[in-house]
Amino acid sequence: MYTIKTLNAISPVGLAKLNKNLFDVSVDTDTPDGILVRSADLLNTAFNDNLLAIARAGAGVNNIPLDRCSEQGIVVFNTPGANANAVAELVIGMLIAGSRNVPAAAQWAQSLAGDAAMAKSVEKGKKQFVGNEIKGKTLGVIGLGAIGSRVANCAIALGMEVYGYDPYISIDAAWNLSSQVHHCVNLNDMLPLCDYITIHVPYLPTTKDTINAQTLTLCKDGVKILNYARGELVNTPALLDALETGKVSGYMTDFPTEALLGKAGVICTPHLGASTPEAEDNCAVMAALEISDYLKNGNITHSVNLPEVVQPRAGGKRICIIHKNEPGMISQITALTTEAGLNIENMVNKSKKNMAYTMLDATGAVNAALAEKLSAIPAVIRVRIL
């Protein structure tokens, strides 16, 4: 029986994916085998020694200490794409709303309460909110992952000309992307072409301030920018300067800050991107399935700190080893399995940066003594026998 601790409210649709005969779900345990989390801050949390996995029901993992988890042999999962439709729909909605000045117009309409000549006031006042149609306009999409590719495809369907930039596009994303999306190999070449720019990349040291003073100079005058990925991807002082000069005519974002609120041309939504019951259910289901498969079978899918390793069982016991990505590890591991007289039925080894994972199915005397010897290899962090 594995114990799963839930932090935050996890959708019951996801929890239902955990077999009650194998998993005990609790909010009170101090010694969980796995943790399901949404937004709770774990950065300063001391983890129990037997904690094996943390699954984040969402894409971002900046609330989880990844380096420390790797050092302790804790696999961290996220759920990329589970909330993609929710975010993409909001982006398209805000693209249209921002173009047609809907938020400001709707707010102004509320001020007409009690106006005896409302019809005349409407006809007179609507002129200040005239906006543009998006059909025939050019959209630049930075990042063509699960969300960016959906936004690009939707924009194509709405009659926009779409350019996409993503030097790291996955095979799956490429297959799902409309052939009508123009591929740009250089961001600086794409920016001058776009009436609208939407950004869909993770927040990393290398992506911080993707939109900055220099990139803004390359943009069309009057460009509109949408940021429903992470606030830090856009340099706020540079953006505000560009709004003041008219280089940027509109900024739609899901990340309000004191500096942005009340500024002309800025539309802030309160982090609504994934705030739908459907997205919460999808994230919870994916997180539950990931943590379940890892605890039961050692398979790793959508981990942010360990490589993806998924293999069907080949019989016998399964040995799962988290270790540092160093030369000679395979030979040290197989030397011990040979010494134990094991027959390896299946074996896979993959690495991710400085971490690696070796999983093998073997018949013979797979026991605690072997696990102890494997654990004694200096670069080995954790050994599990399933």
Language-model segments: residues:
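An N-terminal-biased, well-structured beta-alpha scaffold segment characteristic
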Residues: 1-79, 192, 212-214, 218, ...
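Oxidoreductase and adenylate-handling cofactor-binding alpha/beta cores
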Residues: 88-107, 153-160, 286-299, 334-338, ...
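Glycine-rich Rossmann-fold phosphate-binding loop(s) that bind the pyrophosphate
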Residues: 144-145
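N-terminal Rossmann-fold NAD(P) dinucleotide-binding loop
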Residues: 148-149
